[in-house]
Structures are given as C-alpha cells and as structure tokens.
Swiss-Prot record:
The organism's taxonomic lineage, starting at the top: Bacteria, Pseudomonadati, Pseudomonadota, Betaproteobacteria, Burkholderiales
Protein name as annotated: Undecaprenyl-diphosphatase
Membrane topology term: Multi-pass membrane protein
Keywords: Antibiotic resistance, Cell inner membrane, Cell membrane, Cell shape, Cell wall biogenesis/degradation, Hydrolase, Membrane, Peptidoglycan synthesis, Transmembrane, Transmembrane helix
First-level EC class: hydrolase
Name of the gene: uppP
Amino acid sequence: MTDSTLHLLKAFFLGIVEGLTEFIPVSSTGHLIVIGDWINFASSSGKVFEVVIQFGSILAVMWIFRARLWQLIRGTLTGVRQEVNFTRNLLLAFLPAAVIGAIFIKSIKQVFYHPGVVAVTLVVGGFIMLWVERRAPHTPGDAPGAADDTASDERASAHTLEQISAKQALGVGVAQCVAMIPGVSRSGATIIGGMIAGIQRKTATEFSFFLAMPTMLGAAVYDLYRNIGLLSQHDMSAIAVGFVAAFLSALVVVRAVLRFVANHTYRVFAWYRIALGLVVAAWIYAK
C-alpha cells in the first residue's frame, strides 16, 4: 500500500468518525483530536481538512431537514408568528457562542486542544449527563433506560420547537459556549443545556440540530477564511474523500438519533464518554 493510498484511507476513516460523532453527545472534535493522533494523520492543509469534513456533516443535517428549513425561511419572511419566534430563538441561541468564539477561540484552541483535556472533559461530561438524565422522570412500565417523551413529562415546559421560550433558547446558547472546549460536545452541551432549561429530550435534540446549522456554517466559513492559505493541492483528494465520508455517515446518524431519543435516554452515551475518557487517559499515561 502506497503512502498516498494510506493517507486517503485515513482521511476516509476520519470523515466517518466526524459524521458518526458530530450529532451525538460524545464530542466529534475530541474524537478527531484523539483518533487523528492515534493513526498519525497529518494534513498539509492543517485546519482546512477538519473544517471541510465538518461542513459535510452540516450539509447532511440540512438535507434531512430541508423541508422544515424551507418552511422556517418562508414563514419568517412572510411573518408567520411561530416561525418568526423559532428564528428568534435560533438567533438567541447562536449569538453567545458567536461572540465568545470571535473573541476567545484562538486562545481556547491554544490552551485546550490536547488529548489530556479531551480525556477529562469526556469523563466529566459523562457524569453530568448521568446526573441530568437521573433528574428526568420516568413513567411506570418504561423499559430500563427508556424515558417518557410525552406531555406527561411534568418537568419539561417545552414539548415542541414552537413552545421553546426565548429564555430557554438563550440558556441553550450559553451551554453551547462550553462546547468550545474539546471533549465537551456541541450537541451534548446544547441538548443537556436544553433539558436543564425545561425542554423535552427529543425537542432539545431537534433544536440542537437546527442550531448546528448557523453555528457550524458560521464556524466553517470563518475557519476556512482564516486558513485558506494553508490549502494544498496535494491534499485535495484527502479533503474530498473526508467530506463525502462525513456527509454520508452523518445522514445515517441524524435519522438514527431522532428515532433513538424517542424511546431512550442518553445514558448509553454518558457511559461511553466515561469509558473512552478513561481509555484516553490510560493511553496518555502509557506514552
């Protein structure tokens, strides 16, 4: 196997990792940092590779929600109240991370982008998820790990996207700021933040997917603009392979997650985070 073929296989693998982990609460960035280090993936285009494969993931979620997205855009432009309110909530949730990111993202990456930080945040985030899920009420007859995702969930005040309040949306936005630290997980922070704010689990998950569109698109455009000079012709094939792999795998994951959260909690992901964090810590210690 030639070096160029091996490089493409690594890019394909990392694209799959990005697509599989971007929309579940396990931290795609943390996985890319750790696994990229494990397989010794080196891109001459630097940050551009990561930006492009994340763009592949966000295009997948936009494709899946294309009908609802078009309804949102059309309704907002024509003044439909519930669509205007939904757009307002997305803007409120987007702004905190946009402001904090514009000011501090360079410092955050310099200080926190390290496997050791990922190990700690994976474990801590896992225990926080377990704590939040433990607070979620269950109905009699639920299977182990299943939760009530109906209006009988008395602790949730928002059971649909239209019922989310401006205060709840802003709370989700503040939670998203924490996800700038690798290993925290953007989807995990926004979903758990939403649940703490009183948004039902499935609705919080859907809101997280919609919030990912402006957040990830904005971050991708900003990072691509800042790093376009690093783009190498030699790396174009690897970037294209990673993009396609991320897009296709994200298509599968987003649909699967929406089905999963209708009848299950996020506990399995919490335990996965804790286990992976301990493995990463052991690997760092053994190096």
